[in-house]
């Protein structure tokens, strides 16, 4: 066994807020004593923006603006140059989670075209003959809860051939009448999206009904913007030709890391939508879309 580095963060869930102290230990393990030129710890937060393949041709001039946006970057020395004894050595550290100037700590978010990530990187510098050691560890930032109470915004909906948009041959569609409601499209990110759906009538047999959560990511600048919608998760809420006039509950938990409070900045936007998708046996696909506003309470 050679020399290994590890970073252990004090909080088990690794979740921190702006202004808090990030603390833990750097663990150095070695069977022999280790000579080193110093051990440092770097905290970094970046927003990585990426264009989808379909946008690249249109936005070549746009590449300059899609450089990673740095939110936070600071380094502290954990150990001065010297010698570490054999065995396991734990060096405690504390890092204030503070940003400079008008910058904002956006919430951690792992998307497709927008990625907001915070990392701690430990570097042990060694002499020319020995390889430098590096260890990286991710921690999670949550935005501050919004002030005031969340105002519910219930939505009632009906889906019929007449309410559908983008239909080429409306006359060929089988007759159906589906109604339901969402309890709120203003959603606390820690609470599930809930509602119900009732199929009152359908000439064609129903194959399945699904609830689909979609992220809409926009990367933009002076030259233009690219807007892409991608699926986060899909939940089947009914399988087969369900009974008519039966209330089917809608229930969806927002997945951690893959969702964040709805975010709008000068360079990028992260928004969320939910689709109610009904698939009929004649391969007709019916989709009803609802924009959501997510926030942390």
Curated annotation (Swiss-Prot):
<dbReference type="GO" id="GO:0006886">
    <property type="term" value="P:intracellular protein transport"/>
</dbReference>
<comment type="subunit">
    <text>Component of the commander complex that is essential for endosomal recycling of transmembrane cargos; the commander complex is composed of the CCC subcomplex and the retriever subcomplex. Component of the heterotrimeric retriever complex consisting of VPS26C, VPS29 and VPS35L; within the complex interacts with VPS35L. Interacts with SNX17 (via C-terminus); the interaction is direct and associates SNX17 with the retriever complex. Interacts with SNX31; the interaction is direct.</text>
</comment>
<dbReference type="GO" id="GO:0032456">
    <property type="term" value="P:endocytic recycling"/>
</dbReference>
<dbReference type="InterPro" id="IPR028934">
    <property type="entry name" value="Vps26-related"/>
</dbReference>
<comment type="similarity">
    <text>Belongs to the VPS26 family.</text>
</comment>
<dbReference type="InterPro" id="IPR014752">
    <property type="entry name" value="Arrestin-like_C"/>
</dbReference>
<keyword id="KW-0967">Endosome</keyword>
<protein>
    <recommendedName>
        <fullName>Vacuolar protein sorting-associated protein 26C</fullName>
    </recommendedName>
</protein>
<dbReference type="Pfam" id="PF03643">
    <property type="entry name" value="Vps26"/>
</dbReference>
<comment type="function">
    <text>Component of the commander complex that is essential for endosomal recycling of transmembrane cargos; the commander complex is composed of the CCC subcomplex and the retriever subcomplex. Component of the retriever complex, which is a heterotrimeric complex related to retromer cargo-selective complex (CSC) and essential for retromer-independent retrieval and recycling of numerous cargos such as integrin alpha-5/beta-1 (ITGA5:ITGB1). The recruitment of the retriever complex to the endosomal membrane involves CCC and WASH complexes.</text>
</comment>
<dbReference type="GO" id="GO:0005768">
    <property type="term" value="C:endosome"/>
</dbReference>
<dbReference type="InterPro" id="IPR014756">
    <property type="entry name" value="Ig_E-set"/>
</dbReference>
């Amino acid at each position: 066994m050679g020399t290994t580095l590890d970073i252990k963060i004090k909080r088990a869930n690794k979740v921190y807020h702006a202004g808090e102290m990030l603390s833990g230990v750097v663990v150095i393990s070695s069977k022999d004593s280790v000579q080193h030129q110093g051990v440092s710890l770097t905290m970094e937060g970046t927003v990585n923006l990426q264009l989808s393949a379909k946008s690249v041709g249109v936005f070549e001039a746009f590449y300059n603006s899609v450089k990673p946006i740095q939110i936070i970057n600071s380094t502290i020395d954990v150990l001065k140059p010297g010698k570490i004894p054999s065995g396991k050595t734990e060096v405690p550290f504390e890092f204030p989670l503070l940003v400079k100037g008008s910058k904002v700590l956006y919430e951690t978010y792992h998307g497709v075209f927008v990625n907001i990530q915070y990392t701690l990187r430990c570097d042990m510098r060694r002499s020319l003959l020995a390889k430098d050691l590096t260890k990286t560890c991710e921690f999670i930032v949550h935005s501050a809860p919004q002030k005031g109470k969340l105002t519910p915004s219930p939505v009632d909906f009906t889906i019929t051939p007449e309410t559908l948009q983008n239909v080429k041959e409306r006359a060929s569609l089988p007759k159906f009448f589906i109604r339901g409601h969402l309890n709120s499209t203003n959603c606390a990110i820690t609470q599930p999206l809930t509602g119900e759906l009732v199929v009152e009538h359908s000439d064609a047999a129903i194959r399945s009904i699904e609830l689909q959560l979609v992220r809409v990511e926009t990367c933009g600048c002076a030259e233009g913007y690219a807007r892409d919608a991608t699926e986060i998760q899909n939940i089947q809420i009914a399988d087969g030709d369900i009974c008519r006039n039966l209330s089917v509950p809608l229930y969806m938990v927002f997945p951690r890391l893959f969702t964040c409070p709805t975010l709008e900045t000068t360079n990028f936007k992260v928004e969320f939508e939910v689709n109610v998708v009904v698939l009929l046996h004649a391969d007709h696909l019916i989709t009803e879309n609802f924009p959501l506003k997510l926030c942390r309470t």
